Amino acid sequence: MLRTHLSGELRKENAGQSVTLTGWVNRRRDHGGVIFIDLRDRTGIAQVVFRNEDVAERAHALRSEFVLRVTGVVEERPEGSQNPNLASGDIEVSVTEFEVLNESAPLPFQIEDSSSAGEVGEETRLKYRYLDLRRPVQANALRLRSAANKAARTVLDSHDFTEIETPTLTRSTPEGARDFLVPARLRPGTFYALPQSPQLFKQLLQVAGMERYYQIARCYRDEDFRADRQPEFTQLDVEMSFVDQDDVIALGEEIISEVWKLIGYEIKTPIPRMTYADAMRRYGSDKPDLRFDIEITECTEFFQDTTFRVFKNEYVGAVVMTGGASQPRRQLDAWQEWAKQRGAKGLAYILVGEDGELSGPVAKNITDAERAGIAAHVGAQPGDCIFFAAGDTKSSRALLGAARGEIAKKLDLIKEGDWAFTWIVDAPMFEPAADATASGDVALGNSKWTAVHHAFTSPKPEFLDNFDTNPGDALAYAYDIVCNGNEIGGGSIRIHQRDVQERVFEVMGITGEEAREKFGFLLDAFAFGAPPHGGIAFGWDRIVSLLGGFDSIRDVIAFPKSGGGIDPLTDAPAAITPQQRKEAGIDAKPKPKAEAQAEAQAEESAEK
């Protein structure tokens, strides 16, 4: 090794020892001819001092991010010069000799000054990601991710799970987003697809009798740009045979609990459960943030005889902003712009005065009886503001759900270090295909119905006989785990019977011929004694970003893409040459399947 010790691990107990350190120049200071350098390695910083005239003279040429190897004696710092902000702040190393292992060009941004991090554009940070990762906060994010991987593996290994890698070159099968396609050079005109998830392979592993599988899996989805999404991402993927929903949830809680211990937080288990219907009714979201106690109050029945045209609608609901009646007019106008940015016409409101009198546009248009009872109906007190949404149920609840989150921010109801977990169960099995398309997803099949989770989720047992006759009423045997308003994992009990799977395909408008073409290998496997099975997948990037307190998952990915799937570091994606295009067979017409199979068999025979 080029060093004997690590910079961040030196202590007073090392005083008097001769040590050799290696690392980067984090900061350089010149005090009257004596050079002080903060030497940084992966463990932290140690102050090294160049007092000797020979070494001090040479040290004048050192600059930020030069790579050094220094040898010297550990000394206790003089009284009053200790640095309590450094683990090694009680000592310094008096340098007797040093070697410049490499120099650094002028930096595109300062590394040692963490306060400037917010001033550096993200494109620049990602272009020079190898420099960005020298910052302790960024480097520690990757170390936290590694620790989370280890914690999850420890739990799963203790339950006799087997870690198995599944293919990343497979066939294109519809799973809810567009596939990334890879040309197969040896079969011109045909393409592999990168997997959107290991879903089908992990189910096949259950058919194979593995019973307990897991994988930290890379997944790929060619989606339109959405904030804080990545075209390639990681999930902790788990599948088990001979289990029910409670078994998978219990294991999921054990994994999450162990991971959150990394930041010193003890999750209380069992984690509460909430039905999808309750979540939408009370919070306007299937991933509610429960760190604050604001709920939606349904007012549809209250206003059933109203003369106010706006409230003559399918749905009317409200949320209360405590103390909101004191908001100035410009803030109330800002709420209207906020709502319009979310596709609504506005956000109706009533102000409850300190004397209990109601004011605002809505108060002027409702009946005396409605004015007399609305505050009590929604639980508003003098000084509060009542916000309303009216229209179709889904979009109105979504607007109120977003409003409760905005209210919580404005009232500072979310405290740092608060954690709130819940399971969302009993979600619909199918949704209108138009709704899926409107939200940016790919609606599978050619029907007015598509799967909410995916096509391989089993209906709850009570809907097994009639889910195809009443798709809109069927509930899925599925469960999602939500943390602080973020979905961090989701799973389901899977279909393991061929006839049930074929019925689901029929509901989604996937014909028997198309099902055999796309999923024939899975349907065939179900004919050979597939066991009941279920599983869960955790969004690992999201979990680590929450653990580390990061706003974006990009901060916990070593080399993330920026908006639109661009990699500023390598400038990917990039054009290919005409020769590459020709060799890849992108424009070739694929041979008939039978002919291609015959050629493949002939090639195999020739090799033997």
Curated annotation (Swiss-Prot):
Segments passing through the bilayer: none
EC number from the UniProt entry: 6.1.1.23
Database matches in Pfam families: GAD, tRNA-synt_2, tRNA_anti-codon
Residues reported to bind ATP: R221, D222, E223, Q230, E487, G539, W540, D541, R542
A single GO molecular function term of this UniProt record: aspartate-tRNA ligase activity
Reaction(s) the record says it catalyses: tRNA(Asx) + L-aspartate + ATP = L-aspartyl-tRNA(Asx) + AMP + diphosphate
Subcellular location: Cytoplasm
Residues binding L-aspartate: E175, R221, H453, R494
Region (Aspartate): 199-202
GO cellular component: cytoplasm
Positions of region (Disordered): 566-608
The protein's name: Aspartate--tRNA(Asp/Asn) ligase
Organism for this UniProt entry: Corynebacterium glutamicum (strain R)
